[in-house]
């Protein structure tokens, strides 16, 4: 293995001169990024190209659920504080919160579930959910987050477990240049490409 700096030098680059790579203001008119969709909207609607108007921003956080780890055979159902059962309710809560805002382009995903102690004969004592909420409308994103917070409080009270939200990142959506979008539409029409006005759920550099 080699470091990134070593790789740059191997390719003939000078890592110490990285500041010289900054493009000077006024030396460019615009940026346009061509990218695969990373989704299925264009495929399912049978359009060749998408003209993007907004880039969604992710808000990422963990939900920590603290229950009690007990023997799975010796602990009656009514005496359990199963962190994974509570976590399952919160996974559904994330999905339902995003569903209510889907018309505004918001989505919610629980992509990772960490369960402790992770044994088949032990009632889960602790669970961490890794959550990704994103959208193009800040107020819609906030409504999703507020719904999740409220459900987290309800689950904590009803199930007798500890629930804590740990914020990781919270970025802001970006609106793209309308004139450039209009120019892209004109080019598509001129060349005979079918196109769809849409938002980008994935982040992009341009």
Across the structure, where does each feature detected by a protein language model lie?
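Charged helix-capping and loop-helix junction motifs
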Residues: 48, 149, 179-182
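Active-site proximal loops enriched in glycine and acidic residues that flank catalytic Cys/His/Asp
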Residues: 112, 133-135, 145, 167-169, ...
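Short amphipathic alpha-helices in soluble, non-transmembrane regions
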Residues: 143-153
């Amino acid at each position: 293995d080699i470091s990134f700096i070593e790789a740059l030098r191997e390719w003939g680059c000078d890592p110490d001169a990285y500041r010289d790579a900054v493009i000077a203001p006024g030396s460019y008119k615009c940026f346009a990024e061509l990218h695969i969709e990373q989704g299925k909207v264009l495929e399912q609607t049978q359009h060749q190209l998408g003209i993007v108007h907004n880039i969604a921003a992710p808000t990422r956080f963990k939900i920590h659920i603290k229950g009690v780890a007990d023997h799975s055979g010796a602990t009656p159902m009514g005496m359990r504080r199963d962190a994974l059962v509570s976590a399952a309710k919160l996974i559904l809560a994330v999905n339902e919160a995003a569903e209510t805002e889907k018309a505004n382009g918001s989505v919610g995903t629980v992509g990772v579930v960490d369960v402790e102690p992770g044994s088949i004969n032990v009632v889960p004592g602790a669970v961490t959910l890794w959550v990704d909420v994103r959208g193009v409308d800040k107020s819609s994103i906030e409504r999703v987050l507020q719904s999740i917070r409220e459900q987290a409080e309800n689950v904590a009270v009803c199930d007798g477990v500890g629930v804590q939200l740990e914020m990781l990142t919270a970025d802001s959506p970006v609106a793209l240049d309308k004139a450039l979008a209009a120019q892209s539409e004109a080019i598509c029409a001129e060349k005979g490409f079918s196109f769809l006005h849409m938002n980008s759920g994935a982040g992009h550099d341009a």
